[in-house]
Amino acid sequence: MLKNFAVLTALIASVTLAEEPYAFRARLEIVHESGLRDAALKPAADEFAFADGVKVDDADFADYLNVSMGVKASVGRNGAVVATIDDGLRDREYVVEVRKDGVEIRGADGRALHQAYYHLEDLMNLRRAPFLKLGRERRRMRFSPRMIHSGYGCDVFPDNYLKRIAHHGFDAIVFYIKDVNRTAAGPNQDVNGLIERARKVGLDTYLYSSVSCFAHPDDPEGKKKIEASFGRIAKAHPGAKGIVFVGESCQFPSKDPRVQPVRHRDKNHDDPRPLAGWFPCKDYPDWLRAVMDVLHRHSPNMEIVFWTYNWSRQDAKLCADLIPNFPDGVSIQGTLGNGAVTKHDNGLVCHCRDYTVSTPGFTDHYAAQAKAAKAGNRRFYTMANTAGLTWDYGVAPYLPCPFQWKKRWDGLKDSQYGVAGLMETHHYGWYPSFISELAKEAYTEGGMDFDEHIRKIAARDFGEANAEKVMEAWRKWSRTEVNYVANNENQYGPFRIGPAFPYNFGGKKILHAEFPQDKRAYHTMRWMAILNFPFDLEQAHEQNIAFVELDDDYRLKQLELFERMRTDFADGVKALKEAAQTLDGARRAKAEEMIGVGEWHQRSVETAINLNRGYLAFKRGDREEVLKYARAEYANAQAALKLVERDSRLGWEPSMEYAAGPEQIRWKLRRMEELYGSALATP
């Protein structure tokens, strides 16, 4: 009876609210949203207004006026906007002057001019009308590149999505390269076509090396293997701006006695030495020099970026001391957050294992690398995740904690680190949100003040009367993110796949093959997530995850923090729901989408709470408590099922595909029904 009721409930929800799988992609291809104008608004005395019949010399901007603002505009010269290239401006710089009779734009080049037009669009979106305040602005993007992976599909970039990326201020894309015309999207990809399509909308292309070439340059066949792999790629794709190397993806048989000279799959777990990919080996500079020589033979201007991500658990000085030995011209990329040690206010200490925004992330490790790069006059990049997402929640579209993100944006602008460029997302990709909108302005010299900007966004999206209520919800969500505990058990466990994570105390060990994952996924669950709670040494070895057993005191302190998070997320959701009740049309729909994102975070935290409480009860043999939290988690998963049916982006991640979608959550519910039966019914 319970099973039939759950299925019936799910079917009713799916009929009334369900969005087809991948329906969110249609939203990603909307370059200009329709109907953004509030027809009741009139221009002020100090504003210029675009009127019907206006001519502008940019087709994209004309489309914006027509579609978003309802202004009948056409493309033509000597119209309301005059745009010219000014050689006297710095790279990426533009000047906008709004007068009573029109707008003048000067840009350092074509890309700068396009960013100027996008800025005009942003201003009118905030105004909700085709009006611009009179005055003069000088603006410049602080960082270049600002590169992102695709949030449409793993290494999939349709034309309109590329345009959307450019509108949000990013200036580069990055995708996996495995071989000539082979990416994470599969073989026979038109890589050069993608490079050209990106170039046409003002985006550079970086290749993320996932090339299989286990070779040492000092070995007899080593340089031949390097030429046969990296040389082929550079020759085939010379239009790429650069290539990114990271330890785990460029393993080689190092001769450094401090490491195991084998591939990851051949690691000896009884040998305490790390693998070459996870250690600053003394012969990394030799390997890089050999690869660089081959790449530049075929593509002389291809930039080489070495990302130190996998070194975060090694001695900071050891890592920084190796950087001066790298070949000249190699850019260094550090990582924010990884390796940070956070002490929470209840005494819990967390060693942050992977990408997190629970801390701004400016560790001594990161600072030492930045200093070494600066001393050697090298370009220093940062893996910042500031497109809006980290591994804190694996299948959410973005983390809605703007005031916490601000700490990172502000830190990156600090000149002591000398940051030149950013990687702003890994393979979990980019989804447009108010977070990336705020980041764009924060990363612009001459940009709008943060407090002013976020207040205008709140008023635009939820109405002036609701702005303060919405701001307070965002403050709560931001404040509570510092309570997140970024250890491996959380990031590879309940927070990776949220309410799809199994509650299985008393059941058989779950095998990865049992999990209903799309077989086309680039990353399988065997690599991406632990499905048993808590995970054990065997699972950790299988996935090369640092295993740290958590004692009961740690779990209880962690639960204190999680329960705060649950309250704060729930309070924020409640406030936004109240605000949304006053809205209608597209504004209401967008508000409900954000509410769903907030509630997904709330439900994910609830899953973590129920798992920890259930485990502690199971450990002490308290079956009634196990069942109590089983019922709580069953209800939580049912509520989450409605969320993922309503918004097809929730529960999805580009490399994992649907890891917590309707199918996965229903699978979890069925397992719980089989394991606990009628005990799941509310007493």
Where in this protein do the model-derived segments appear?
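Substrate-binding groove of N-acetylhexosamine-processing glycoside hydrolases
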Residues: 24, 235, 274-683
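Extracellular/periplasmic catalytic domains that process cell-envelope and extracellular macromolecules
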Residues: 97-99, 141-142, 236-237, 324-327
